[in-house]
Amino acid sequence: MNRPSARYALPEFTERLSTGLRTLDPYSKLLDERIVFLGTPIDDTSANDVMAQFMHLEHLAPDRDISLYINSPGGSFSAMTAVYDTMQFVSCDVETICLGQAASAAAVLLAGGTPGKRLALPGARVLIHQPSLPAPVQGQASDLVIQAAELARTREQLEELLVRHTGQSPERVAADIERDKILDAPAAVAYGLVDRVVPSRKSSAAAPGAR
């Protein structure tokens, strides 16, 4: 698994099992607790890591929730849709929790959690905007036409996902993503991107929600 880089050495935990000692880093320990942490930009590598963890946890216990903690600036739309589709594909309910930020593609993953189980910490922020092409954009005129058509299709798909998971009208979503729309945690609840703001783990027990 490609773990987020740190400016210092991550601590390790040693546990005594019936089969002997086992040493874990924090991310492996979180996985034991059915917590997947997305703390990097979303690209093919991080998406593959998240998808592999989801499928592993579903195999271990298909009837238990998976918690996806998000602190990400967003990233690749295609990588995001791979994770999103996996979230919908697995039989487990997926609880999403935003701490820090869920921006751009990460906001869609936050909103795509199981209804009633989409949470944000008080200091979190969520940002939505329209997709864009990475710079520099190069190629022949015919190539640019193809890229423009794909960008328009991507925007339509993004709008459909936000409408589906927020309950906002297509017209409002289309207008809101024209420029960066930044929402604090209460505003994200009002918009429908998350269900509740949770100040502590004691208050994070989510009511069961239909998928």
From Swiss-Prot:
InterPro entries: ClpP (IPR001907), ClpP/crotonase-like_dom_sf (IPR029045), ClpP/TepA (IPR023562), ClpP_His_AS (IPR033135), ClpP_Ser_AS (IPR018215)
Localization per record: Cytoplasm
Role of this protein: Cleaves peptides in various proteins in a process that requires ATP hydrolysis. Has a chymotrypsin-like activity. Plays a major role in the degradation of misfolded proteins.
Biological processes annotated in GO: protein quality control for misfolded or incompletely synthesized proteins
UniProt cross-references to Pfam families, sorted A to Z: CLP_protease
Catalytic activity as recorded in UniProt: Hydrolysis of proteins to small peptides in the presence of ATP and magnesium. alpha-casein is the usual test substrate. In the absence of ATP, only oligopeptides shorter than five residues are hydrolyzed (such as succinyl-Leu-Tyr-|-NHMec, and Leu-Tyr-Leu-|-Tyr-Trp, in which cleavage of the -Tyr-|-Leu- and -Tyr-|-Trp bonds also occurs)
Family per similarity comment: Belongs to the peptidase S14 family.
E.C. numbers: 3.4.21.92
Organism: Streptomyces avermitilis (strain ATCC 31267 / DSM 46492 / JCM 5070 / NBRC 14893 / NCIMB 12804 / NRRL 8165 / MA-4680)
Keywords: Cytoplasm, Hydrolase, Protease, Serine protease
Domain of life: Bacteria
Location, primary (coarse class): cytoplasm
An MF annotation (GO) of this entry: ATPase binding
NCBIfam families, per database record: PRK00277.1, PRK12553.1
Complexes and interactors: Fourteen ClpP subunits assemble into 2 heptameric rings which stack back to back to give a disk-like structure with a central cavity, resembling the structure of eukaryotic proteasomes.
Residues the record marks as active site: S104, H129
Enzyme class, first EC level, given as a word: hydrolase
Designated name of the protein: ATP-dependent Clp protease proteolytic subunit 5
GO cellular component, one term: cytoplasm
